[in-house]
UniProtKB/Swiss-Prot annotation:
Gene giving rise to this polypeptide: proS
Native source organism of the sequence: Chlamydia trachomatis serovar A (strain ATCC VR-571B / DSM 19440 / HAR-13)
Record family assignment: Belongs to the class-II aminoacyl-tRNA synthetase family. ProS type 1 subfamily.
Top-level enzyme category: ligase
Subcellular location: Cytoplasm
PANTHER family per the UniProt record, alphabetical: MITOCHONDRIAL RIBOSOME PROTEIN L39/PROLYL-TRNA LIGASE FAMILY MEMBER, PROLINE--TRNA LIGASE
Protein name: Proline--tRNA ligase
Amino acid sequence: MRTSLLFYRTSKNANKEASVLSYELLQKAGYLFKTSKGIYSYTPLFQRVILKMTEIIREELNAIGGQEVCLPLLQPAELWEKTGRWKAFLSEKLLYVLKDRENKAMCLAPTHEEVVSEFVAQWLTGREQLPIHLYQIGTKFRDEIRPRFGLMRAKEFLMEDSYTFSDSPEQMEEQYAKLRLAYQRIFDRLNLKYVIVAADGGKIGKGKSEEFHVLCSLGEDTICVSGSYGANVEAAQAIPPSYVYDSNLLPVEEVATPNIRTIEDLEVFFNTPKHKILKTLVVKTRQKDSEKFFAICIRGDRQINLTKVASFLQVDDCELASEEEILKHLHVEKGFIGPLYCPIPCYADETTRPMTNFICANNQKDVHCKHMNWGRDIPLPAFGDFLLAEAGDLCPQNGGAPYEIFQGVEVAHIFNLGTRYTESFSVGFQDKNGDKQLCWMGTYGIGVGRTLAACIEQLADNKGLVWPLAVTPFSITILYNGGDTEGEATALQLYQSLNTEGFEPLLDDRNERLGFKLKDSDLLGIPYKLIIGKSFQSTGLLEIESRSGEKCNVSPENLLDWCSKNLPCHTRKIPPLQEQN
C-alpha cells in the first residue's frame, strides 16, 4: 500500500477527552475516529489490525473444534425473561431497549447466552452431537454510564464469544480446559504480559470463572498475585495480618462522640489503632424484584468486598446503602451504626471474631461504646469472609505466601455455567434409559478492542504505537527523502518486490522530508523501517531499523532473504488492498 492512496491522517494532538495513552495514540495515528461519546469508527488502518487479530482468534478456535456462527444483535425480551436476566439487566440501566411495531420489547445484544441456548435446544438431536463449541466475532452493546478510555469502555464494542454444550460436568471441564489453552495461545501470539486469575462470575453465572488480565498501569482491575496463583481482588481469598487482643474483658463505657463519624476520626479521638475499632456498614441487596438491607461488621483497618457479601447472602447484586436509605431503615445517621440492637440482620467478618474490648457505634447519634465484646455485650453473629484482599495479605492457595498487587485490564473471561441456562431452555438429550438429561454449558469471551487497547498501553513508547508483528497493519515501511528521484525509483522497485511476496510493505511516497516520514512511521507503530538514505548511493546498502531502535544494513539482493527470516507473510490471510493506476 502507498501512503498517497491510504485514507488516513496523523495529527499532533488528540481529542481533549483522550485521557489514556491508547485512546490518544489511536487518534493521533489515524486509527480511530470518534463518532459520538463511546462510539467509534475504525479507519482502514485499524480495520487491518482488527482483521489480523480476529484471524488469530479464528485459527486457534478452529483448531480445537470451534464452529463459527453469527447470532442476532437484536434480541427479544422473552428470551431474557426465561432466565430472569431481563429485570436484572434493566435494573442496572445498561441495556439498549426498544420496541418493534408490534410493541414487543427488544434489546441490542450485550451477550448471547439466551439466544444460543434457544438455538441449540431446537437443533440438538442426540448425545452423539456433544460436545458442541459455537463461537462468533461480532458487535456488542452496553449503555455505559460513563464511557471513557476509548476502546476500554465503549458503548459499542467488538467481541469474540464462545459457547460450549457438554453431556456431563466432566466433559464441560474438558471444554473449559481447551478454551483456556486456546485463549492462552491467542495472547501468547501477541507477546503480551498477562495473568489468568480466579474471578467472580457476576450476573453471567456462579460457576468456575477466570479472567485474563493484561498487566499495565492503566488497568481498572486490581489483581492479587502470589507465585503462580492469581485472583481478581473481588474473588481473592486472603489471610490478613492478625492481632493479639486483651484477654481481660473490661466493663462497657458509653462515650459522647459529637460528629465523630469516620474510622480516622475515631482513631484520633480514642487514641487507638484502627484494628481495635469495629466498623459497621449497611448494604442493599437485590434478588429479582426484592430489595433487602443488611449490616456487615468488619475490622476498622480493612475494606469491605461487596462481591463476597453478595455471594454469602446469595443475592444477585449488592451495594452500599445511601445515607437516606440508612436513615429510613435504621433511624440513625451514617457513622453511628453498630451491631447492638441493630434492626436489620447483622453479619461479621471472620477477622472480627477474636476482637475484644473493641470500640463501636451503638445506633445512637454522637455516641460510641468502648470495651464491647461478642457474646457478652452483643449477640454472636454469623461470620463470613467479607474482606477485600490487600498487598501483604497471605494467600491460602500458595502456602501462605504474601500477595503482590498489580493493575490489569481484563481482556477475556471464561465461565462454567453448569445447567443455569440449559434448564431455562430445556437444552438436553435422552440418555440410554430414555431419560432427559440437561446439557452442561460454558461461556467464554475476548474483548477484541480492549485487547488491542491493552496491547498499546503495555507496549507503546514516547514515539507512538508499537504493534506486535502478529497484528501490525503493515510489516515494514519503505522510506526515502521526498524529491529524491533515484531514491523514489529504488523504493518503488523494492515495494513491488516485497508486495508480490506478501510481506505487506507500506511505501511512503509523499513528497516530505525523510525525518518527517520516520516520525510518522514510529507513530503508526510499524515494526520495521526500510530506509533509502544518503549512504545508499555510495554503499549500495539499505538501512533497516526496528521499532525498538536496532539497526542493520542489507543489500537489495538480500532483502527478500532478510524479510523471510524476520517478517510474517500475510498473503493468504489479508487480501492486498487494490491500488489505483
